[in-house]
Design a protein with these regions (language model features):
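A helix-coil-helix interface module used to build multimeric assemblies
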Residues: 2-222, 226-231
Length: 231
């Protein structure tokens, strides 16, 4: 929906919208819907690859190979448009449940692809938070890797050049706010470079846990339905 920036609730989408526009692909409601579709699709594909007995023949009689169908399913999120996301929102008006709307959206596309006989394994055994608790870490991870870290590296590069340019520039240092011994401007900027490099190193060590556990966190439905699979 188009709106005047002065009507935005938050400065993020108002005053600073031009500066934060690249984050919309990660943190907008559209992005959340797209990643929910992504998690649901990849989960279904994984069930096919195990395979569950009922999915061993997935794709037979459709005129397409399994890999071709997997590609078509992945296009649901890889090529998703705001218009597609609006379809999910329209379904939500009926379901009154945002994740269930995603499930129904995917099932509608199963019908369009001629694979509706396998559609009941979409969201099999899961609860909504399994989808949310996987989608949201993906959003954070990709925003950090694709937006924040490149920007941080650019800042470090600029400051490092300043450190080199100013390495012999003397300046007065202070202790307790009082003039003290001299230092060099380049060295003082190197302090900030070192701090940012340490933060960059720590970002590189981050892990991104997700959670699949079913309704009560014990994979109960999975175990009852398929007891021979190590869930």
């Amino acid at each position: 929906m188009d709106f005047h920036s002065l009507l935005a609730v938050s400065p993020i989408d108002g005053r600073y919208a031009a500066k934060t526009a690249s984050l919309r692909q990660y943190f907008s409601e559209f992005a959340l819907i797209r990643n929910r579709v992504r998690v649901e699709v990849e989960y279904f594909i994984t069930l096919c690859e195990i395979p569950l007995p009922q999915l061993a023949d997935f794709g037979e009689g459709t005129g397409m190979s399994r890999d071709e169908l997997f590609t078509r399913l992945r296009q649901l999120y890889q090529s998703m448009t705001p218009e597609d996301a609006q379809k999910v929102k329209d379904i939500e008006k009926i379901t009154n449940h945002d994740v269930k709307a995603v499930e129904y959206f995917i099932k509608e596309n199963f019908k369009a692809l001629g694979i509706s006989r396998w559609q009941e394994f979409v969201h099999f055994g899961l609860t909504s938070q399994d989808i949310n608790n996987t989608s949201q870490p993906l959003m954070l991870k990709e925003a950090l890797e694709n937006e924040y870290i490149p920007a941080l590296k650019e800042v470090i590069s600029i400051l490092s050049a300043d450190v080199e340019a100013w390495k012999d520039v003397p300046m007065l240092a202070r202790t307790h706010g009082q003039p003290a011994t001299p230092t060099r401007l380049g060295k003082e900027f190197q302090v900030f470079v070192s701090r940012l490099e340490e933060q960059l190193r720590q970002f590189g060590q981050l892990t991104w846990p997700a959670k699949f556990g079913g309704a009560t966190g014990n994979m109960n439905a999975h175990k009852v339905a398929f007891p021979d699979i190590d869930w």
